[in-house]
């Protein structure tokens, strides 16, 4: 039973530990991601941030427990930190997005409904008019926006973002942040990794400082004011 006035959890990490070849990547990590919140994880390189997200997605084994308290269908959207494209494949932005929006191969054409939905998604992420651009010629920032568009339809209950602003210009970062705020207003929970402390201040409800263990966790403004988080971040990323 959740006490009155307390936002119920969507995801709970309980004593999560991960080791690889006797190296402890995460040690007894416990934290709670509240429903409808923007929860940001910060920490130095090698702190286990991406590892924790990967465990939350069920992609790697771990010790401990990760509990999900879904309100709906439990759909998860995911934008990874890195995404590689085979330059020999003539796949366009529309082809890629159509693969998950219609039940036939794209070689038979893209349905009118799928094409309209794809155009709308691309407008949302600032890629209006790039439907027929090959993925292989897109910049890293543009590829990241394509992945974000793919993660948003249908609206996920949990959106997992691993350094989503990487490779984006100032305008792209602003669009991303506006989109995160809109998603939060729609009831989507956002769990993200960021090295940009100004972005964290603008977006986060709660912050977890991770360095293989939870260093501290709490409301964003209070946590950032109480701890020298910038000292933990990679050089050049302490904005």
Annotate each language-model stretch with its function.
Residues 112-130:
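Conserved ABC ATPase "signature" region
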Residues 134-138:
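Conserved ABC ATPase signature
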Residues 159-163:
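Catalytic Walker B motif of ABC-type/P-loop ATPase nucleotide-binding domains
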Residues 170-172:
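Helix N-cap at the start of a conserved alpha-helix in ABC-type nucleotide-binding domains
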Residues 200-202:
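A short, surface-exposed alpha-helical micro-motif characterized by mixed small hydrophobic
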Residues 213-236:
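Conserved beta-strand-loop-alpha-helix hinge in the C-terminal portion
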